[in-house]
């Protein structure tokens, strides 16, 4: 909307239906591959993460792309006519917004993981020894008894000792819900002005 066209300049307001998916390039734990590695075998960007921008009728030359007042990059008239996938541009306002959402979701997942590890100890040790949900000194003694012989208890025992306290578990659940609420509040695309302007000096 709000389209404005001149000989060397094009501006309009753009509101996407969804945010771009920020591809994760990080390694977790002992993983040998990243999420980004899958792009070489799956056409994810073309089929599920395509935020296309295509402009035809431009004169030959280089054009600057500005989104939301931020300069994004330089493209030729031919590249713009062929179309660019803005989801690949990690410096756009919408990509930065998506990254914040991803970071909040990772924070939420880390808190959820702690709860899962607590429940793992409860169901794989405390349930078998008749101490399910006891979370008392007798349960602590049970952990100490079996921990030296179980690598998973060695990994998760300290966390269980912390999360055996109901208040800490409740805080963790509330923090997860707060993050979920914030994610849903902030994951909506906003209108952005896009400007494509021809470079006169290179």
Predicted regions and their residues:
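Conserved catalytic region of serine esterases and O-acyltransferases that act on ester linkages
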Residues: 1-202
């Amino acid at each position: 909307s709000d389209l404005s066209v001149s000989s060397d300049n094009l501006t309009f307001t753009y509101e996407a239906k969804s945010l771009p998916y920020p591809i994760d390039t990080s390694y977790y734990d002992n993983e040998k591959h990243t999420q980004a590695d899958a792009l070489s075998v799956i056409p994810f960007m073309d089929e599920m993460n395509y935020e296309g921008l295509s402009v035809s009728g431009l004169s030959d030359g280089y054009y600057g792309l500005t989104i939301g007042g931020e300069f994004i990059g330089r493209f030729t008239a031919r590249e713009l006519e062929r179309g660019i996938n803005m989801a690949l541009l990690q410096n756009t306002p919408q990509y930065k917004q998506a990254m914040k959402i991803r970071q909040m979701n990772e924070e939420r997942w880390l808190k959820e993981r702690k709860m899962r590890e607590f429940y793992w100890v409860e169901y794989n040790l405390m349930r078998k020894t008749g101490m399910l949900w006891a979370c008392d000194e007798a349960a602590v003694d049970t952990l100490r008894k079996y921990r030296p012989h179980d690598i998973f208890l060695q990994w998760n025992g300290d966390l269980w000792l912390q999360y055996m306290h109901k208040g800490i578990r409740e805080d963790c659940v509330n923090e997860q819900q707060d993050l979920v609420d914030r994610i849903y509040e902030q994951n909506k695309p906003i209108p952005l002005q896009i400007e494509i302007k021809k470079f006169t000096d290179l």
